[in-house]
Amino acid sequence: GRGCRAGRPRSPGRGMTGCWCLPMQAELDGAAYAIRTDYRDILELLRWLGGTADPQLDQSGRWYVAMRLFYPTFAEMPQACWPQATDFLAQFLAAGRREQARPGPPLMDWQQDAPLIAAGISRAAGQDVRTLPYLHWWSFLAWFDAIGEGSFATVVAIRDKLRRGKRLENWELDFYRTHRAAVELRGPASPAQEAEKQRLLALLQ
């Protein structure tokens, strides 16, 4: 079968062209593939990758769903291109940055923390980004990185201290007691919990 080479971007928007351009398509083996770039689409994709959309899917299954969500014409993509397409998706999610993963459990969850993140990003952007008809994922991340002091920063700082066994300040302890449900990250539902959820939903229909 025909191999797949990651095409070298030759013009803005044709691939991963660095942080000064916003990639709008992927070039794989000389062919251009459309990609979904709006931050809402990417957050949905991350919900599947993180296992919250379907806890019963294994890692390979999650990535397969993510690829189908990211590439609208994934069904037409030669299977030989899948590894390069996966690499492109991973780089896109990281906004082209090469960052070392932090050890230990995650400190945030895009779904659980959505209200806090939306408030912080809207403050950084000077507008409610949820009302925008379109916002590129990289632009969304740039505003996310610009979130300063606020509830989201406080929640993440407390989670980090709890993870490392550090003592909380008195005001942090008060915040934790008052907003415990917001501070404590909820993991994906277990198969048993998901089955019970589906059973209850069936009773309501």
Predicted regions and their residues:
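N-terminal regions encompassing targeting/leader/pre-sequences
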Residues: G1-R2
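Charged interaction scaffolds used for protein-protein
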Residues: R5-A34, Y39-L43, G50, Q59-Q205
